[in-house]
Amino acid sequence: MSRIGKIPVQVPSGVDVDIADRVVTVKGPKGTLTHRVPAPIVVARGDDGALVVTRPDDERTSRSLHGLTRTLLANLVTGVTQGYQKNLEIVGTGYRVTAKGSSLEFALGFSHPVTVSAPEGITFAVESPTKFSVAGIDKQQVGEVAANIRKIRKPEPYKGKGVRYAGEQVRRKVGKAGK
């Protein structure tokens, strides 16, 4: 039995879960998220109202999808109650970010400013010219938008300049020795 998959997903008060035709819909104070459950996995409501994820057999695909499905459902419940946020920071002389409505404009050493618009369900917050955050209810979407922003100018290993996650340790290299 999967150690993660056998743990029931607790559903807090104020969150409504609907299971219909292999689609789980979670409604909460922050919004609504849906997830399609893969074929061998079964999701049901437990006695205490929690979501219980089970698998019919011990085949490899069933075992691999068991814990995954449970974790994805737990992420839906957390998303509609608390939401998710990724904090990023910019390191480098002259590198900065400004908010332009619902989009961000970056000055990252290119000959032009780079503009990133917020997809539906994502909000940007700029705390300072070098610190900003990406927030939303869908964990996968928040992570993907943050990764795409980081990809614009990844931290380089010699001076560490670029966009990085808050608290990220950049592996540094020693430059070539001068004469």
Curated annotation (Swiss-Prot):
<comment type="subunit">
    <text>Part of the 50S ribosomal subunit.</text>
</comment>
<keyword id="KW-0699">rRNA-binding</keyword>
<dbReference type="InterPro" id="IPR019906">
    <property type="entry name" value="Ribosomal_uL6_bac-type"/>
</dbReference>
<dbReference type="InterPro" id="IPR002358">
    <property type="entry name" value="Ribosomal_uL6_CS"/>
</dbReference>
<protein>
    <recommendedName>
        <fullName>Large ribosomal subunit protein uL6</fullName>
    </recommendedName>
</protein>
<keyword id="KW-0687">Ribonucleoprotein</keyword>
<comment type="function">
    <text>This protein binds to the 23S rRNA, and is important in its secondary structure. It is located near the subunit interface in the base of the L7/L12 stalk, and near the tRNA binding site of the peptidyltransferase center.</text>
</comment>
<dbReference type="InterPro" id="IPR020040">
    <property type="entry name" value="Ribosomal_uL6_a/b-dom"/>
</dbReference>
<dbReference type="Pfam" id="PF00347">
    <property type="entry name" value="Ribosomal_L6"/>
</dbReference>
<dbReference type="InterPro" id="IPR036789">
    <property type="entry name" value="Ribosomal_uL6-like_a/b-dom_sf"/>
</dbReference>
<dbReference type="GO" id="GO:0003735">
    <property type="term" value="F:structural constituent of ribosome"/>
</dbReference>
<keyword id="KW-0694">RNA-binding</keyword>
<dbReference type="GO" id="GO:0002181">
    <property type="term" value="P:cytoplasmic translation"/>
</dbReference>
<comment type="similarity">
    <text>Belongs to the universal ribosomal protein uL6 family.</text>
</comment>
<keyword id="KW-0689">Ribosomal protein</keyword>
<dbReference type="InterPro" id="IPR000702">
    <property type="entry name" value="Ribosomal_uL6-like"/>
</dbReference>
<dbReference type="GO" id="GO:0022625">
    <property type="term" value="C:cytosolic large ribosomal subunit"/>
</dbReference>
<dbReference type="GO" id="GO:0019843">
    <property type="term" value="F:rRNA binding"/>
</dbReference>
